Amino acid sequence: MEAALEQHLEDTMKNPSIVGVLCTDSQGLNLGCCGSLSDKHAGVISILPQYAAKLTTDPTDVPVVCLESDNGTVMIQKHDHLTVAVHKVTS
């Protein structure tokens, strides 16, 4: 699984507008990262979708957390027990 995850991270980074990608488990453990997102971001990235899910009354709703700045966007979404973050730069 580790090799497959690393391959997915590398494939994601091939997109020129993506400068970082990170995958964590539900405990905030960094499972893999590339580019601008690193181990120090794992805890915060894993908790944001959990807080966002508390803002909806629909338990099947899966929110995407978007952190936007003038320089780009970090999109974060939880899938089952994994959380994925992608950092895209503004073109």
Swiss-Prot record:
Keywords: Cytoplasm, Lysosome. This is Ragulator complex protein LAMTOR5. It comes from Xenopus laevis. Belongs to the LAMTOR5 family. Signal peptide: none annotated. GO terms for cellular component: lysosomal membrane; lysosome; Ragulator complex. The keyword Protein transport does not apply. Its main location: cytoplasm.
